[in-house]
Each structure stands twice: as C-alpha cells, then as structure tokens.
Design a protein with these regions (language model features):
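Core beta-strand-centered patch of the WYL/Sm-like small regulatory domain
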Residues: 1-84
C-alpha cells in the first residue's frame, strides 16, 4: 500500500521510471483504498514525489492481462514486473 497525497491506496506495483513529462513515477493497478473518482480497480500513474510512505503487505497479485511492460506513458522504465 502507499500513502499518496495523504490518503491510503492499495496498489499492485508494475513499473517505476520517468513519465513523458519527465517526472519519476509509479505505474500501478489500484485495487483498494481512497479514490477521488470512486472507480476501482483501475490503472493509475503516481508521481513518486507525492508518495508519502510505502508498506509492503503480506499478499501477492497475479499479472493483470492488460499489463504492458513497455508502457507508452513512460519515457524511461527503471524497474518493471517481468512476465513469465
């Protein structure tokens, strides 16, 4: 889970890198917690500078069928979940 802009969000992290605007970012699939839109689950792009804390939960997740390891929203990918 992450605390983003002061609110807890439960996410499955997939990619970390630099987005198209030049910001360090996390691409994740949000499955719970706060959502201003209320539309969950959903893919989200989180700016690392706005993540206040991270907690590793005792859970796992299956690779989402829409996961793209070559995410077009990222200019450079530093770390990614690998598919089998």
């Amino acid at each position: 889970s992450i605390v983003y802009d002061g609110k807890v969000r439960i996410v499955d992290p997939y990619l970390v890198g630099i987005n198209k605007k030049g910001n360090e970012a996390l691409r994740a699939y949000q499955v719970g917690g706060y959502s201003s839109s209320g539309n969950l689950p959903a893919w989200r792009l989180y700016l690392l500078k706005n993540i206040n804390s991270v907690e590793i939960l005792d859970t796992s997740f299956k690779i989402h069928p829409q996961y793209n390891p070559n995410d077009k929203g990222m200019a450079r990918i530093s770390c990614r979940v690998e598919t089998a």
